[in-house]
Amino acid sequence: MSVPNSTQQPDPSRIMQIGMGFWASKLLLVAIKFELFTLLASQKSGAGAIKEKLGLRTTDQHVFDFLDGLVSLGFLEREGILEKAIYSNSPDSNIFLDKKKPSYSGGILEMANNRLYEFWGHLEQGLLTGEAQNETKGAGNMNFFEDLYKSPEKLREFMNAMSAIQAGNFISLVRQF
């Protein structure tokens, strides 16, 4: 076996980044679920005010960690530290994650958090058993859309998700004409 000519040393960082990627995903999905970006679009806030407005009952340190995680991922900006920190949306978050804006693209991410995240957690079982790992699991019915139309709430969430994921295509189409 020959080794490719390269001066680069093997590096596990990409493996670790992808393997632990659910940390970043869940931070973003929870922030969307809490409508944090909508809250911060109207006013910059400190961690204490955010904790109160969102009804969080965890420790202040956990709130700092949650918010600072979002800062490190580029979804929030921060001025100051700890109790003196003021948090605001990053430009992208302000445009695409504020539910009150027509540019809101979080619908697909809401569905990812509410439905898909759990199902992907059962990928191993699905591969081993061949059984569906979504709402049709155990029902013997593989017709996802039939089940979807039975629940107005799930249908609305699905439609919002599809709208969010297609928004960029619609904008491109309009720009062409």
Language-model segments: residues:
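Conserved Class I S-adenosyl-L-methionine-dependent methyltransferase catalytic core
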Residues: 2-6, 11-49, 53, 60-177
